[in-house]
Amino acid sequence: MIPLSQKNLVEIRKHSLEDYPNECCGIVIGLAGSVDKDILFRCTNIQNKLHEMDPKTYPRDAKTAYNIDPRELFGIFNQIDSKKLVLKTFYHSLPDHDAYF
């Protein structure tokens, strides 16, 4: 289990409530072995856009799926590389449905 600061746990909960009824998604990065200076990124869930463009390939909408904007991912991973940080976790909410896999 990845430890997260209380501040980031509160922020993730807030994010999920604000994006409801859609899934929220985000990424936490920081220094290895520490949670004090972790950086939380709220990411854009582009699942509805993908579903509208191609419902056959993307049959689920943002109420039951998430897909992070690749430009945001690129920017976050650039920060990881340039600042010598590590990826701590991806997060997303599960509004009104269970985890399934």
Describe every region a protein language model picked out.
Residues 1-86, 95-101:
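Conserved beta-strand-loop surface patch within small alpha/beta domains used
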Residues 89-91:
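Conserved catalytic cores of phosphodiester-cleaving nucleases, focusing on short active-site segments
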